[in-house]
Structure formats: structure tokens, C-alpha cells
Amino acid sequence: MDMNTFPASTYCESIVRFLDAIEYHDDNLTHEERVEGLRHVHSKTAQYFTEPLPRSILKGVAPRRIAAVTRTISHFIVYCWSKLPREAQVDVSIYLSIINVLDDEISSEPSTQMTSFWSDLIQGKQPKHPFWVLFNSHLPRLLRHYGSFCAFNIMRCTFDYFEGCWIEQHNFQGYPGADCYPSFLRRLNCLGGAVAGTIFPAAKFDEQKLFAQMSCVMAQIDGPVALMNDLFSFYKEYDQDEANLVSNWCTVDGITMDQALTRLTDDTIHACVRILDILKDKDPDMLATIRGFIHGYATWHICDFRYRLREIYDREDLQESGARFREYFDKAIDVGWVDVEEWTCQVQGFEVEGPAPSGSEVQAYQANAFGFSVDTQRHHNIDYVGSSILGLFEWATRYLRGKLPLGNA
């Protein structure tokens, strides 16, 4: 799709409709709590990648990419798993960082390395694929925080995610009329089960007492996790020729991108409002946890440069919805923005060549986490390491100026 035809006003209406529907108000953390959480989770996550096993397995991965992933995922965990005990946050952060660092490895044809996977698993042998080598080591460390039901869902979702990546590397969008295919693939790779499993630690939630409520959350959580991400990703993925939920809908159902955006917005609102409505008269801590995740998830998307929502904010062709969009954007930045020097630190054994990120450049630096560039002259999926450092600094400077009062610009 041509970015010149992007329906900016319609997209603003969609974001505003969604944030209105959930009554967006992220009161999860104070600024000081965000800073403390980011410092701890980021430093411990980075330290993991200095250990011998990940160093050996990931020796072909650029340190700059690993650094970008640890920053992005640390943000994600602290903002969305805000009520989780700190050490559990660290282990969830490592779990998701492994997934994202190895995303390219999964997306290359894994059939050969997976030939003996199940027999090796059953017989307790070392797996061959690097994804499973690292998880064979880390999963016991993660699962110690959870009861058996949550742990089972974390494991189930980990297998699902790998399968989803395996399918996605073929870039197959489904046949016309295969109306179940888009949602099937999205459920596999959205990590909803891992979110629901990791958000309820055994130290704070009694699985036996809350089993019915947890089961219901497991059934409902894929929608908020997947669809919120798809809604906030709609702009940055608009001109990319890749299979995703929206483009798959267009292929199998024969609808336009505008129609797909309307469906996506309606489905996202339904998924989030429904899960909160179901829990409103249930365990108050469970409701607070899910509400905190949804509102923190919105804040994280707006604060993360990879979603490029500042570009929408700065457009001059927005209609009435543009003002409301900017209000919500500013609200999220005010509560969620943390400058890099407030929380990053050097981790011994984890040195990255080149200039260290400083100030607001951190969010642009994070652009490598999922392989997207924030170079505004080239919107496509390109490697951060090969992109223009000057372009990133210029983009970050424009962003910072955009969020400051006009008198300071």
C-alpha cells in the first residue's frame, strides 16, 4: 500500500474510539516506580546475555540488536506486568527477549533442526534448534514463579509461538474463503497464553481458589494481546508487503484495508471491554491486574518509537479526531516517557560498539528490536545497523521537540 493514501483521520478515529472505550487512564506506576523498575529489569535482562550459554548460542547476533531488544522488552514488562514481583519481571523479560532475539532464527526454515525434536524432548536429550536450547535452560527458571496451571499455559503458548513463526516464514496469507486462517495464525503467535500465564504469580494468586477465573482469562486474553498490537501497528505496517492479521483478512474475505481497519477497531474494543466486564465482580486483584496490563499496553505502544505514532500526531491533514488523538498521545507520553539516562546503565561483559544512547534517543535505538527502522525516509522493514545513525538522531530530536511546550521548541 502507498503511504500517501493512508487514512490518517480514520485511523485517529479508531485510536480515539478504542481509548474512549477502555476509559484510558494509566495509573499503574509513579515516575519513580517506572525508573526503579526499568533500571532493575533492564540491567538483569542484559546480564543474562553475558552468560556463557546465550553468548555461545547468539554469537552470530549483532550485540546492537540484543541491546535494542533488552531495552524494548524491559519497557514492555515494567509497563504491562506492573504488578508482578520484581524477580518474576526479570525472568519474563528474559523469556520475551529470547523470543525476539531469535525471531529471525525461527523464521528461517526449521524443519531439519526439528526432525528429532519430539523424541529428543521425550527422552530428555538436548534439542538442536537454538530457540529450544535457550528455553530448555531458561524455562525452569521462569516457571518457578507460577502454579502448575499457569506454567502449563506458558509452555503451551511457547510451542504455539514457534509453530506460528514456522508458518509465517512461508508468508502465506490463506486461500480466499479460508475465513478461520487469519485468526488461527494470529492466536498462535500472539503469546496470549504466555501473558495470561506469567501475569498471575503463585505468590499472589491461588490457582485452586481462582481456577475458574484464570481459565476464563486464558480464553479471553488473546484478543486484547493480539488486537491491541495490531491496532497500534496498523500505521507502521500499512505499506509493508507482509502477511499479518489485517492483510490476511483482506486476502481471505476480499475486503479493503479501510474495512479491515473498522473490523480491527471493533474487535479490539469488544475484546478489551468484554474481559474487563467479565471480571468486574470477580477477584479485585485479578481485575486490577488485567486492567493494568491493558492500560499499560496502550501507554507502551504510544511511547515506543517503533509504532511511529508521532508521525500521525504531526500531520496537518487530520480532521476533528486529530485533536482527541493528540490529547491521548500527550497523556500517554506524560505518564510513560522516561529518559534513557534515568534508567540505563553499563553492564559488564555486554559492551556495544558505537556511541551509547543518551536522552530520548533510546526509543529510536529500540527500533531494532523487531527489525523496523524509524528512518522516516524509508518506512520499510530494514536492519537498524545498516540504517542512518544521523537519521535516527534527527527523528528523535523532532520527537522530543514535539512533546515539549511550543515555547521550548
Swiss-Prot record:
Superkingdom, natural source: Eukaryota
A Pfam family that the UniProt record links to this protein: TRI5
Keywords, in A-Z order: Lyase, Magnesium, Metal-binding, Virulence
Uses described in the biotechnology field: The fungal sesquiterpenoid aspterric acid (AA) is a submicromolar inhibitor of dihydroxy-acid dehydratase (DHAD) in plants and is effective as an herbicide in spray applications.
BP-aspect Gene Ontology terms: sesquiterpenoid biosynthetic process
Residues that bind Mg(2+) 2: 229, 233, 237
Motif WxxxxxRY motif positions after renumbering to this chain: 316-323
Motif NSE motif, chain ranges: 227-237
Coiled-coil intervals: none
Cofactor list: Mg(2+)
Binding site for Mg(2+) 3: 241
Listed transmembrane segments: none
Documented EC number(s): 4.2.3.-
Binding site for Mg(2+) 1: 103, 168
InterPro entries, per database record: Isoprenoid_synthase_dom_sf, TRI5_ascomyc, Trichodiene_synth
Disulfide bonds: none
Molecular function GO labels: trichodiene synthase activity
Pathway terms, separated by semicolons: Secondary metabolite biosynthesis; terpenoid biosynthesis
Motif D(D/E)XX(D/E) motif boundaries: 103-108
Function per UniProt: Terpene cyclase; part of the gene cluster that mediates the biosynthesis of the sesquiterpenoid aspterric acid (AA), an inhibitor of dihydroxy-acid dehydratase (DHAD) effective as an herbicide. AstA cyclizes farnesyl diphosphate (FPP) to produce (-)-daucane. The cytochrome P450 monooxygenase astB then converts (-)-daucane into the alpha-epoxy carboxylate intermediate which is further converted into the tricyclic aspterric acid by the cytochrome P450 monooxygenase astC.
Domain comment, as recorded: The conserved active-site motif D(D/E)XX(D/E) is required for coordinating the divalent metal ions that stabilize the PPI moiety of the substrate.
Protein family according to the UniProt entry: Belongs to the trichodiene synthase family.
Name of the molecule in the record: Terpene cyclase astA
